[in-house]
């Protein structure tokens, strides 16, 4: 699994800017309140891009949370993204205080990635899943089960980062990207899968068990 430092590498440019401006304010002896605010913003930026190690002891067939946040939707759909089969969608909303690094919900091969430009409405709203900028990924597990999930940009988030390509093999819980400054991740479960979470439940990426998949019948 990919190793990471204390913060996600995508945050380095932002941290450099905030820390640089704060340092200049101190060197030039700007007003104390200005220096304080700038250093607070620099600290918040570092905290926002934090990337803690996560481990899960969930069963092998379990689907784990791809993101920190709150479950804001659980509903059935006649057709899932990148497949023609009905699915049950579980949506996780990430606010600006959550860890924003995204992790693979299952182990397997990324068979397709599809980027869709779009709007930037509040990611807490259901319509964000179909109207907003989003990046859809389809994975196939070692048992032959296909599962899609998508990164959705939000009102503040205007940048989806996906570090992988089609054909990439991921371990469950492995980092694959992030979304900057508040966003949403949707999971699309096969209809025969078990869902373990409820509306309003808080999730931790790489840890929380979202449900369980059934192996493909021979």
From Swiss-Prot:
It catalyses: a 1,2-diacyl-sn-glycero-3-phospho-L-serine + H(+) = a 1,2-diacyl-sn-glycero-3-phosphoethanolamine + CO2. Binds 1 pyruvoyl group covalently per subunit. The active site is at 183 (schiff-base intermediate with substrate). Its EC number is 4.1.1.65. The record marks 182-183 as: Cleavage (non-hydrolytic). Its main location: membrane. Heterodimer of a large membrane-associated beta subunit and a small pyruvoyl-containing alpha subunit. This is Phosphatidylserine decarboxylase proenzyme.
């Amino acid at each position: 699994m990919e190793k990471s430092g204390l913060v996600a590498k995508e945050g380095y440019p932002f941290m450099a800017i905030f820390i640089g401006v704060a340092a200049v304010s101190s060197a030039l002896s700007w007003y104390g309140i200005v220096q304080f605010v700038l250093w607070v913003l620099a600290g918040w930026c570092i905290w926002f891009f934090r990337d803690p190690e996560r481990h899960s002891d969930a069963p092998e067939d379990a689907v784990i949370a791809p993101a920190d946040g709150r479950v804001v939707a659980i509903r059935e759909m006649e057709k899932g993204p990148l497949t023609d089969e009905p699915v049950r969608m579980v949506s996780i909303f990430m606010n600006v205080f959550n860890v924003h690094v995204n992790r693979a919900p299952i182990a397997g091969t990324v068979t397709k990635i599809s980027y869709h430009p779009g709007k930037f409405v509040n990611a807490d709203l259901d319509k964000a899943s179909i109207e907003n900028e989003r990046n859809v990924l389809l994975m196939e597990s070692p048992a032959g089960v296909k599962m899609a999930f998508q990164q959705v940009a939000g009102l503040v988030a205007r940048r989806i980062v996906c570090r992988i390509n089609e054909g990439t093999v991921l371990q469950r819980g492995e980092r694959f990207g992030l979304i900057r400054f508040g966003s949403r991740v949707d999971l699309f479960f096969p209809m025969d899968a078990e869902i373990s979470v409820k509306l309003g439940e808080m999730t931790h990426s790489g840890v929380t068990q979202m449900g369980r998949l059934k192996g493909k019948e021979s």
